[in-house]
Structure formats: C-alpha cells, structure tokens
C-alpha cells in the first residue's frame, strides 16, 4: 500500500514539473511573439512617409501622394489631401 501511494505522489510530482515546464515554454513563446509584433510595428513607424494619404493634413512641407491633391475644405479648418481622379501606378 505504501508503494502505491508513493508511486501516485511521485507521478503527480512528475506531472506538476512537466506542466510547469510546458507553461514556462508557452509563456516564453508568447513573449517572443509579442516582441516580434512590437519590432514589426516599430519598423513600420520608423519608415518616413514621403507623402500624405487620403484626408491627411497637407502643407507645402507635407505634400500629398501623387494621386491626391491638397485642397482647402470649408468645414475643416485646414488643408487636406483629396483624390485628383487619377490612380497610382504600381
């Protein structure tokens, strides 16, 4: 009877250690994944935009993209980029 109880306790201890290891591995993978996502976001944010997109605020130092033109719109108190009825070439 003592050996059966000892075996059960030992098996539970092994399962606890294995599940802790699995959980630690899963957490490490999750942290690695979130770090990768943050790196991708940071890389896209650091790229300087050469032009302003649709409905973006524009000035002389912030030009619109090729298929947009900078116009003053009355309800809005600043110039915005609007479509000039052309399409960008790819």
UniProtKB/Swiss-Prot annotation:
InterPro entries: Huwentoxin-1. The keyword Disulfide bond applies. It comes from the Eukaryota. Ion channel inhibitor. Residues 1-19 form the signal peptide. This is U7-theraphotoxin-Hhn1g. The presence of a 'disulfide through disulfide knot' structurally defines this protein as a knottin. The keyword Disulfide bond applies. Belongs to the neurotoxin 10 (Hwtx-1) family. 13 (Hntx-13) subfamily. Expressed by the venom gland. Residues 20-50 form a propeptide. It comes from Cyriopagopus hainanus (Chinese bird spider). Its main location: secreted. Keywords: Disulfide bond, Ion channel impairing toxin, Knottin, Secreted, Signal, Toxin. It is found in: Secreted. Disulfide bonds join 51-65, 58-70, 64-81. GO terms for cellular component: extracellular region. GO terms for molecular function: ion channel inhibitor activity; toxin activity.
